[in-house]
A protein has these predicted regions:
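ABC family nucleotide-binding domain
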Residues: 3-224, 228
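H-loop (His-switch) and adjacent beta-strand-loop-beta switch element
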Residues: 228-239
Length: 239
Protein backbone atom coordinates (compact mmCIF):
# COMPACT_ATOMS: atom_id res chain seq x y z
CA UNK A 1 0.00 0.00 0.00
CA UNK A 2 1.10 3.56 -0.72
CA UNK A 3 -0.59 5.59 2.02
CA UNK A 4 -0.43 9.32 1.42
CA UNK A 5 -2.51 10.20 4.51
CA UNK A 6 -2.58 8.11 7.68
CA UNK A 7 -4.84 9.11 10.58
CA UNK A 8 -4.03 7.41 13.89
CA UNK A 9 -6.49 7.58 16.81
CA UNK A 10 -6.95 11.32 16.39
CA UNK A 11 -8.81 13.38 18.97
CA UNK A 12 -9.55 17.09 18.82
CA UNK A 13 -10.90 19.01 21.79
CA UNK A 14 -11.83 22.68 21.83
CA UNK A 15 -12.06 24.82 24.96
CA UNK A 16 -15.27 26.84 25.08
CA UNK A 17 -14.60 29.30 27.89
CA UNK A 18 -15.29 28.66 31.56
CA UNK A 19 -18.24 27.56 33.62
CA UNK A 20 -18.72 27.28 37.38
CA UNK A 21 -18.90 23.87 38.97
CA UNK A 22 -22.40 23.11 40.19
CA UNK A 23 -22.97 21.99 43.78
CA UNK A 24 -19.36 22.80 44.67
CA UNK A 25 -17.93 25.14 47.26
CA UNK A 26 -14.80 25.56 45.14
CA UNK A 27 -14.21 29.07 43.82
CA UNK A 28 -12.33 27.87 40.72
CA UNK A 29 -14.18 27.66 37.44
CA UNK A 30 -13.73 24.78 35.01
CA UNK A 31 -13.13 25.04 31.29
CA UNK A 32 -15.97 23.74 29.14
CA UNK A 33 -14.70 21.40 26.43
CA UNK A 34 -16.15 20.20 23.14
CA UNK A 35 -14.85 16.92 21.71
CA UNK A 36 -14.96 17.51 17.95
CA UNK A 37 -13.13 14.27 17.10
CA UNK A 38 -12.76 11.19 19.25
CA UNK A 39 -10.39 8.37 18.28
CA UNK A 40 -10.61 8.63 14.48
CA UNK A 41 -8.33 6.34 12.45
CA UNK A 42 -8.19 5.94 8.67
CA UNK A 43 -5.74 5.62 5.78
CA UNK A 44 -5.96 7.18 2.33
CA UNK A 45 -3.80 5.89 -0.49
CA UNK A 46 -2.07 7.86 -3.22
CA UNK A 47 -4.44 8.79 -6.03
CA UNK A 48 -7.66 8.15 -4.08
CA UNK A 49 -10.74 10.31 -4.75
CA UNK A 50 -12.30 10.38 -1.30
CA UNK A 51 -15.01 12.21 0.65
CA UNK A 52 -15.19 12.81 4.38
CA UNK A 53 -18.95 12.98 4.87
CA UNK A 54 -21.40 13.52 7.66
CA UNK A 55 -24.05 15.90 8.98
CA UNK A 56 -23.28 19.37 10.29
CA UNK A 57 -21.24 19.07 13.49
CA UNK A 58 -19.95 15.58 12.68
CA UNK A 59 -16.32 16.72 12.61
CA UNK A 60 -15.62 16.50 8.88
CA UNK A 61 -14.27 20.03 8.47
CA UNK A 62 -12.27 19.66 11.68
CA UNK A 63 -10.64 16.50 10.33
CA UNK A 64 -9.88 18.17 7.00
CA UNK A 65 -8.29 21.11 8.84
CA UNK A 66 -6.12 18.72 10.87
CA UNK A 67 -4.98 16.87 7.73
CA UNK A 68 -4.13 20.26 6.22
CA UNK A 69 -2.08 21.32 9.26
CA UNK A 70 -4.43 24.28 9.76
CA UNK A 71 -5.19 23.27 13.35
CA UNK A 72 -3.42 21.38 16.13
CA UNK A 73 -4.11 17.76 17.05
CA UNK A 74 -5.10 17.19 20.69
CA UNK A 75 -3.94 13.56 20.71
CA UNK A 76 -3.02 10.90 18.17
CA UNK A 77 -1.21 11.78 14.94
CA UNK A 78 -1.70 12.33 11.23
CA UNK A 79 0.95 11.52 8.64
CA UNK A 80 0.94 13.34 5.30
CA UNK A 81 3.30 11.84 2.73
CA UNK A 82 5.20 10.18 5.58
CA UNK A 83 5.51 13.28 7.78
CA UNK A 84 3.87 13.31 11.22
CA UNK A 85 1.98 16.50 12.08
CA UNK A 86 1.49 16.18 15.83
CA UNK A 87 4.98 17.35 16.81
CA UNK A 88 5.29 20.15 14.26
CA UNK A 89 5.69 23.81 15.14
CA UNK A 90 3.98 26.62 13.20
CA UNK A 91 6.91 27.18 10.84
CA UNK A 92 7.11 23.49 9.96
CA UNK A 93 3.35 23.34 9.33
CA UNK A 94 3.54 26.37 7.05
CA UNK A 95 6.31 24.74 5.03
CA UNK A 96 4.34 21.47 4.79
CA UNK A 97 1.23 23.29 3.54
CA UNK A 98 3.28 25.22 1.02
CA UNK A 99 5.03 22.17 -0.41
CA UNK A 100 2.69 19.21 0.07
CA UNK A 101 -0.93 20.40 0.22
CA UNK A 102 -3.27 22.19 -2.18
CA UNK A 103 -6.43 23.76 -0.78
CA UNK A 104 -9.80 24.38 -2.43
CA UNK A 105 -12.30 26.39 -0.37
CA UNK A 106 -16.04 26.82 -0.78
CA UNK A 107 -15.59 30.63 -0.80
CA UNK A 108 -12.74 30.37 -3.37
CA UNK A 109 -10.36 32.57 -1.26
CA UNK A 110 -9.04 34.43 -4.29
CA UNK A 111 -7.25 37.77 -3.98
CA UNK A 112 -9.68 40.23 -5.61
CA UNK A 113 -7.08 42.68 -6.95
CA UNK A 114 -5.11 39.96 -8.74
CA UNK A 115 -5.99 38.43 -12.10
CA UNK A 116 -6.80 34.76 -12.52
CA UNK A 117 -3.23 34.03 -13.58
CA UNK A 118 -1.69 36.10 -10.79
CA UNK A 119 -3.77 34.20 -8.21
CA UNK A 120 -2.44 30.91 -9.57
CA UNK A 121 1.14 32.20 -9.77
CA UNK A 122 1.18 32.94 -6.03
CA UNK A 123 1.34 29.26 -5.11
CA UNK A 124 4.45 28.74 -7.21
CA UNK A 125 6.14 31.98 -6.14
CA UNK A 126 5.98 30.89 -2.50
CA UNK A 127 7.98 27.76 -3.33
CA UNK A 128 10.94 29.80 -4.61
CA UNK A 129 11.78 26.90 -6.94
CA UNK A 130 10.91 28.35 -10.34
CA UNK A 131 12.04 31.24 -12.51
CA UNK A 132 9.56 34.00 -13.41
CA UNK A 133 9.22 32.50 -16.87
CA UNK A 134 8.50 29.02 -15.48
CA UNK A 135 5.91 30.43 -13.07
CA UNK A 136 4.08 32.15 -15.93
CA UNK A 137 4.26 29.11 -18.21
CA UNK A 138 3.01 26.67 -15.57
CA UNK A 139 0.20 28.97 -14.46
CA UNK A 140 -0.92 29.61 -18.04
CA UNK A 141 -0.91 25.90 -18.82
CA UNK A 142 -2.93 24.86 -15.76
CA UNK A 143 -5.54 27.58 -16.37
CA UNK A 144 -5.94 26.23 -19.89
CA UNK A 145 -6.32 22.73 -18.45
CA UNK A 146 -9.17 23.76 -16.15
CA UNK A 147 -11.02 25.44 -19.01
CA UNK A 148 -10.11 29.11 -18.50
CA UNK A 149 -8.25 29.71 -21.74
CA UNK A 150 -8.56 33.39 -22.63
CA UNK A 151 -9.60 34.40 -19.10
CA UNK A 152 -6.14 34.58 -17.53
CA UNK A 153 -6.18 38.39 -17.30
CA UNK A 154 -9.63 38.74 -15.74
CA UNK A 155 -10.21 39.68 -12.11
CA UNK A 156 -12.29 37.32 -9.92
CA UNK A 157 -15.15 39.85 -9.91
CA UNK A 158 -15.37 39.51 -13.69
CA UNK A 159 -15.92 35.75 -13.49
CA UNK A 160 -18.79 33.50 -12.43
CA UNK A 161 -18.71 31.39 -9.27
CA UNK A 162 -17.89 28.27 -11.26
CA UNK A 163 -15.04 30.04 -13.05
CA UNK A 164 -13.66 31.35 -9.75
CA UNK A 165 -13.68 27.82 -8.36
CA UNK A 166 -11.73 26.70 -11.43
CA UNK A 167 -9.07 29.27 -10.54
CA UNK A 168 -9.01 27.82 -7.02
CA UNK A 169 -8.54 24.33 -8.46
CA UNK A 170 -5.75 25.55 -10.75
CA UNK A 171 -4.01 27.26 -7.83
CA UNK A 172 -4.15 24.06 -5.78
CA UNK A 173 -2.96 21.85 -8.63
CA UNK A 174 -0.18 23.97 -10.14
CA UNK A 175 2.40 23.15 -7.46
CA UNK A 176 1.80 19.40 -7.89
CA UNK A 177 0.98 18.71 -4.22
CA UNK A 178 0.88 15.32 -2.54
CA UNK A 179 -2.77 15.87 -1.65
CA UNK A 180 -5.57 18.30 -2.48
CA UNK A 181 -8.06 19.13 0.29
CA UNK A 182 -11.43 20.52 -0.78
CA UNK A 183 -13.77 21.91 1.88
CA UNK A 184 -17.35 21.86 0.54
CA UNK A 185 -16.13 22.96 -2.93
CA UNK A 186 -19.63 22.98 -4.45
CA UNK A 187 -21.46 24.69 -1.57
CA UNK A 188 -21.70 28.07 -3.31
CA UNK A 189 -22.48 26.70 -6.77
CA UNK A 190 -25.70 25.78 -8.54
CA UNK A 191 -26.30 22.17 -9.59
CA UNK A 192 -24.97 22.67 -13.13
CA UNK A 193 -21.70 24.24 -12.01
CA UNK A 194 -21.37 21.72 -9.16
CA UNK A 195 -21.54 18.86 -11.65
CA UNK A 196 -18.98 20.54 -13.91
CA UNK A 197 -16.54 21.16 -11.05
CA UNK A 198 -16.75 17.58 -9.74
CA UNK A 199 -16.34 16.16 -13.23
CA UNK A 200 -13.30 18.41 -13.77
CA UNK A 201 -11.75 17.25 -10.50
CA UNK A 202 -12.35 13.61 -11.42
CA UNK A 203 -10.58 14.14 -14.73
CA UNK A 204 -7.64 15.89 -13.06
CA UNK A 205 -7.43 13.18 -10.41
CA UNK A 206 -7.24 10.48 -13.07
CA UNK A 207 -4.76 12.40 -15.23
CA UNK A 208 -2.35 13.49 -12.49
CA UNK A 209 -2.94 10.72 -9.89
CA UNK A 210 -3.18 13.38 -7.18
CA UNK A 211 -5.02 12.39 -4.02
CA UNK A 212 -8.22 14.42 -3.54
CA UNK A 213 -10.07 14.56 -0.22
CA UNK A 214 -13.39 16.41 0.09
CA UNK A 215 -15.38 17.36 3.16
CA UNK A 216 -19.02 17.38 2.12
CA UNK A 217 -22.64 16.61 2.88
CA UNK A 218 -23.57 17.06 -0.80
CA UNK A 219 -25.17 13.85 -2.10
CA UNK A 220 -24.01 14.57 -5.65
CA UNK A 221 -20.38 14.76 -4.53
CA UNK A 222 -20.73 11.54 -2.53
CA UNK A 223 -22.17 9.75 -5.56
CA UNK A 224 -19.10 10.67 -7.60
CA UNK A 225 -16.22 9.87 -5.26
CA UNK A 226 -14.71 6.41 -5.10
CA UNK A 227 -14.69 6.14 -1.32
CA UNK A 228 -16.53 7.75 1.60
CA UNK A 229 -15.24 8.11 5.16
CA UNK A 230 -18.35 8.78 7.25
CA UNK A 231 -18.30 10.65 10.54
CA UNK A 232 -20.99 11.04 13.17
CA UNK A 233 -20.58 12.93 16.45
CA UNK A 234 -16.82 13.08 15.95
CA UNK A 235 -16.35 9.34 15.42
CA UNK A 236 -16.23 7.00 12.45
CA UNK A 237 -19.73 5.94 11.44
CA UNK A 238 -19.59 2.41 10.07
CA UNK A 239 -23.32 2.08 9.54
Amino acid sequence: MNEIVKILNVCKTYSMGTQKKKFSKAENDTTAKVHALNGVSAAIEKGEFTAIAGPSGSGKTTLLNLIGALDSITSGDIFVDGTGLAGMNKKQKTLLRREKIGFIFQSYNLIPVLTAQENVELGLQLLNSFSKEEVKEKSWAILNEVGLNGMQDRLPSQLSGGQQQRISIARALVKEPAVILADEPTANLDSKNSAMIIELMKELNEKHSITCIFSTHDQFVMQNVRRIIRLKDGMLDNQ
